[in-house]
Amino acid sequence: MLVEYLFMAHPEDGADTISHWKMDIDGTEITDARAGFGSYRDTYFRYAFTIQCNAATESIANGQLAGWTTAKTINITARSYSTSYDQDVHATRYWDGTSATHFHRPSLFLTALS
């Protein structure tokens, strides 16, 4: 299954950003899904990871499930590298000739792969 999370972000202080993103299934982190993003201006990001649902051996840290027959909770979380690189997520900083911040709705796509 392909998990894709698309979102807008911009530097909180107007300079640049560094952020770290991770995903977990039922509270266990998929360490192979760790990612970092950075930008200097409004940027549209794509955080994505493919979960293998028919693995011979289950290893959530590697994104491998032996099967998927019950409900599962997938969490995507993020943090700034430090307060010097804060990121305002789900927003634009610049719009129509001004620097007013506007909300931008994120998108989540779950695609079954065969």
Go through the PLM ranges and name each one.
Residues 1-114:
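Extracellular jelly-roll beta-sandwich "head" domains, especially the C-terminal globular C1q domain
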